[in-house]
Amino acid sequence: MKLPALAAALLAAPLLTGPAAAQTVSIVTTPAGSYTNSAGAAMAKVISEKSKVRAILQAQAQQGMIPVEAGTAEFGMSNSFDLTFYVTGTGEYEGQGVKKKTRLVASLIPYRVAFHVRADSDIKTIADIKGKRIAGGFNAQKTIARITETLLASAGLSYKDMVEVLAPNVSRAAEDFTAGKTDVLFFALGSAAVKQAAATVGGVRVLPITDSPEALKRMEAVLPGSYVVEVRPSPQIDGVSAPIKTLAFDMVLCTNIDVPEHVVYEATKALHQNKAALAATFGAFNLLVPDRMAKPVKDVEFHPGALKYYQEAGIAPKS
């Protein structure tokens, strides 16, 4: 005996609601142990718990915008200057053409990056690393080479002044530093990989950056939009025992224009309204200023779903 159509629909209804019905999306990050990967894990957790969307991590070596533009991932994490270069086909992406599908979701927390040395090293300043061994190449993460060049430029140095040890990405660079193959480690402050390196080599020390007008001009020429911030000692940051200045630029979340508006809206809302939950998983999110999430990135359009939420929240950028 067949059930009436209405009864069948009522029985099926529970199967179409709740967590099981949530749309699953992926967030592309850099490899496990990196600052971006840790931030992405916190974001995926909050989006999954605080919205109608289920988010999972997709850690890989390539830049997060690439699978987003290709449509193989819904969200990707990057930084402000690299996203601009990618979308406009400039910088490391010269000759690759304009990307027409990548859109901005949010400007998040600052990447605070620095050179690290072993705690017992006689290296005290960035100028002191001239002639030392440092990771380079970064074929899988070309933007890392540019950031490294920016830090070197702050002291009037370049890769030509260094002994370059080739590494495909920052994770390999951290392994080489721990193994004693390099003298200097570039990484974001507070990253899991830095903590692991510190535990292995007996501690690390962060090299301060100078913010003289000349240094700022040299850095801006290499890394547009970068800035200098003061970092104070914190249990979450290895290698900082007194207030110092470091290089910074913004972490951003991007998506594809074809990702449904409601999905991006839900993700944006969850991130904006749950700073405490984000910080509970990854302490760097204590630096998040939710109402600055709508900060524009040069030459990159907002996704309509993100813009809709920002308009409702009263923080949309002025056109």
PLM region descriptions:
Residues A9-L10, A20:
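Cleavable N-terminal signal peptides
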Residues Q23-E49, V53-A55, Y111-E175, A179, ...:
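Bilobed "Venus flytrap"/periplasmic-binding protein-like clamshell domains
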Residues L16-A22:
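Sec/Tat signal peptide C-region and signal peptidase I cleavage site
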Residues A179-G180, L189-V206, D211, R218-E220, ...:
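An extracytoplasmic/periplasmic, membrane-proximal ligand-sensing/linker region
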Residues M1-A8:
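Bacterial N-terminal signal peptides that target proteins for export
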Residues F75-I109, A192:
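Acidic, polar ligand-binding/catalytic clefts
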